[in-house]
Amino acid sequence: NTYISANHPLYDSTVPTYPYDPAQANSILEQVGWRDVDNDPSTPRQAQGVLNVPPLTPLVLNYYTSSATQRRQASEILAQSLGECGIGVNVTYLSYLDLYAEGGAGGPLFGRNFDLAQYAMGTTSLEPPCSWFTTGQIPTESNNWVGANVTGYQNPEFDAACAWAQEQTPDDAAYREAYQSTQAIFTSDLPAIPLYLRLKVAAARPDMCGFALDPTANTLWNIEALDYGANCAP
């Protein structure tokens, strides 16, 4: 529902949610001019009176992601769901090098040349990464296509809320309020849809001690504390 996990201590559970509702989606599409002109839900809707879109243009989106198994599974589910609303989807699976290529070199992601794109984002801090969606993080030619905000989302109110949040410390009274403000704006504008959390999985021998996963660190972050067998205290 927002750009941080629901398990995060700063997650705002009061933000609005968007349930899966094809009937409501179809109604909204009809209202804005995307019509099911042939009365066939399996074919893409067509434009009738949509601003800046030629009449009868089919509603077909180009969707880019990597060829990883999990990405393929997610894209197939999303394409099927969008199809229930008369939205066609052309899914293109790219190598990591091609998907994450520099924008100036023709990369669809950092060049922001896509209708839909599925990609991974990660953080090594517990601090909510609101900067992912700030104006200064938009990849452009002027900043050598470096930046996390591949959506191109721009909202001065969000930028200000994020900057304010980053100025606070966890001990400040405004700390929670500041980050919840960014979540409220994000959820209202919804520049991106967080799909799922990637689980961190590891295995250890039964008599290993000191082994503990940290979501913000490498699996062997505390390698000095690891031991096994008789060396482990009861």
Placement of each model-derived feature along the sequence:
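Periplasmic binding protein-like
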Residues: 83-143, 178
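Append "and occasionally in soluble cytosolic enzymes with long acidic Gly/Pro-rich linkers
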Residues: 1-80, 84, 154-160, 181, ...
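Structured segments of extracytoplasmic/periplasmic soluble domains
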Residues: 28-35, 78-88, 102, 106-108, ...
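Surface-exposed intrinsically disordered loops and tails
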Residues: 38-40, 54-58, 101-109, 142-146, ...
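Bilobed periplasmic-binding protein-like "clamshell/Venus-flytrap" ligand-binding domains
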Residues: 1, 34-65, 110-117, 168-206
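Long beta-strand-rich cores associated with HINT superfamily self-processing modules
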Residues: 133, 145, 202-234
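Active-site rim elements
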Residues: 13-16, 148-151, 163-173
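Solvent-exposed loop/turn segments at secondary-structure junctions
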Residues: 8-11, 67-70, 96-98, 121-126, ...
